[in-house]
Amino acid sequence: MFIVLEGIDGSGKSTQVKLLSKFLAKDGYPCVLTREPGGTSFAESLRSMILHDPIDPMARLLLIVSARVDHYNKVILPALKEGKVVVCDRFIYSTLAYQGYGDKIDLQTILDLHRLSGCLVEPDLTLLLLGSGHKKLGRDNFERMPREYLSNVCMGYEKIARMYPNIHVIKCMGVGRTSEEIVKIVQGKISEKQTSSCR
């Protein structure tokens, strides 16, 4: 089962990824915790350029897709074939939100690049964390973007959530309550998957 957590920086997403993977491991599910951009030595080597270097938006998109291809083929797909639960911090919907709605790159171009590279994959479950507001932390290129850019990304995420039925939108309510809601949704999805596989 492939689970992805999405959201803008400062939404608490990375914290919830760690909490969810701990819950799954405690419940006896073999779990792989990973992130994007990154997850392999090659993808991690591109991460710094993607997040920190002043490069053209299309060049950044191509780096992101390159990192994703390597990550998907070397980490995600093998783990899924072994029957493990993969919990990933960001995946394709981040690219649609940031590069599509933020950088204004045509969405179909982004999808076509993924299709051509063999990683146009919909996760089994995507949890989109929407906070009350963006925290401008200034740690990377995206966090330093103007408020208008970040507003476009947020709007993009909301539009994407309406386009894809496997995305569950979660309003952040503090670490504890948000974690409880995530666990409840994941438990339901796992039960649903187990039931369908028994038919």
Swiss-Prot record:
Membrane-spanning residues where?
none
Q: Name one GO cellular component term.
A: cytosol
User: What EC number(s) has UniProt assigned to this enzyme?
Assistant: 2.7.4.9
Lineage, top-rank taxon, reads Bacteria
Protein species of origin: Neorickettsia sennetsu (strain ATCC VR-367 / Miyayama) (Ehrlichia sennetsu)
Q: Which reaction does it catalyse?
A: dTMP + ATP = dTDP + ADP
Where ATP is bound, by residue?
Answer: G7, I8, D9, G10, S11, G12, K13, S14
| Pfam families assigned | Thymidylate_kin
**NCBIfam families assigned to the protein according to its UniProt record, in alphabetical order:** DTMP_kinase (TIGR00041)
Q: Which UniProt keywords apply?
A: ATP-binding, Kinase, Nucleotide biosynthesis, Nucleotide-binding, Transferase
The record's similarity note reads: Belongs to the thymidylate kinase family.
One example of a Gene Ontology biological process annotation: dUDP biosynthetic process
Task performed by this protein: Phosphorylation of dTMP to form dTDP in both de novo and salvage pathways of dTTP synthesis.
Q: Does the keyword Lipid metabolism apply?
A: no
Q: What is this protein called?
A: Thymidylate kinase
GO molecular function (one): dTMP kinase activity
